[in-house]
C-alpha cells in the first residue's frame, strides 16, 4: 500500500499546527473556552512550539479575566515567537490585558516595545492603538498634554506616510494638530478629506470647531 502521508509537501506539519492554533484562538475569542482548551491540548500533544502554545493559553486566560497570568505568558511569547503576525497579535492582546487591569502605563510600554521590535510595516495596529492612548492621556493629564499630543502626532504622521491614511487616522491627526495650535496643518488635513469625501459631514463639523478654536485663540471670539 502506498504511503500518502510520506508524500506530504514540505511545511505541512507547520501549516497544520498553525491552523490548530488559529482555531483555538478563534474559539477562545468566540467564548468557547472549553473547546479552545481542547485544541490547545491537541497543539501540545502534536509538539507545537512553546511560543504557539503559550500564545493560545494566554488568549484563553485573558478571556477568563485572569489578566496577571495572561500577561506573564504574553511576555514569554515576545521572546518565543518569530512569526510577525503572531508576535503582533501577542503585543496587541497583552496591551489590552493591561488596559483591562486599568494599567495604561503598562499598555503603553508594551505597545512601544512592539513598535520597536516588530519588522517595519508590521506595527501598524500597535501605532494606531498607541496614538489613541496618547490622545486619551493628553485629555486626562492637562499638565503634560502637549507632550502626549506630540507623541500622538508623530505616530499618526508615520501611519499616514506609510499608506495607512484611513479617515479615522487623518481625523485624529487633525485633532492633534489643532490641540497643538498647528491650525494651518490641521486645516490642510481637513480640506483634503473634504475634497476626497464631499458628502461626509464630519469634516465640515471639525473644520467649524477648528475655526472657532482659532478665533478664540486670537481673541476675536471670547
Regions found by a protein language model. Give the residues of each.
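Alpha-solenoid helical repeat scaffolds
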Residues: 1-222
Amino acid at each position: 500500500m502506498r504511503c500518502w502521508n510520506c508524500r506530504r509537501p514540505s511545511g505541512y506539519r507547520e501549516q497544520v499546527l498553525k491552523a490548530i492554533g488559529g482555531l483555538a484562538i478563534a474559539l477562545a475569542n468566540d467564548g468557547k473556552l472549553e473547546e479552545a482548551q481542547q485544541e490547545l491540548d491537541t497543539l501540545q500533544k502534536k509538539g507545537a512550539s512553546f511560543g504557539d502554545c503559550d500564545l493560545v493559553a494566554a488568549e484563553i486566560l485573558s478571556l477568563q479575566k485572569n489578566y496577571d497570568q495572561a500577561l506573564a505568558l504574553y511576555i514569554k511569547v515576545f521572546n518565543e515567537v518569530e512569526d510577525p503576525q503572531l508576535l503582533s497579535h501577542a503585543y496587541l492582546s497583552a496591551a489590552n490585558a493591561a488596559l483591562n487591569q486599568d494599567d495604561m502605563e503598562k499598555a503603553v510600554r508594551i505597545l512601544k516595545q512592539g513598535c520597536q521590535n516588530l519588522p517595519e510595516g508590521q506595527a501598524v495596529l500597535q501605532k494606531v492603538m498607541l496614538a489613541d492612548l496618547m490622545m486619551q492621556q493628553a485629555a486626562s493629564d492637562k499638565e503634560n498634554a502637549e507632550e502626549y499630543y506630540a507623541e500622538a502626532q508623530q505616530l499618526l504622521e508615520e501611519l499616514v506616510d506609510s499608506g495607512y491614511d484611513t479617515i479615522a487616522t487623518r481625523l485624529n491627526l487633525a485633532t492633534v494638530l489643532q490641540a497643538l495650535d498647528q491650525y494651518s496643518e490641521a486645516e490642510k488635513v481637513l480640506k483634503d478629506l473634504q475634497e476626497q469625501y464631499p458628502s461626509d459631514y464630519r469634516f465640515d463639523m471639525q473644520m467649524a470647531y477648528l475655526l472657532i478654536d482659532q478665533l478664540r485663540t486670537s481673541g476675536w471670539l471670547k
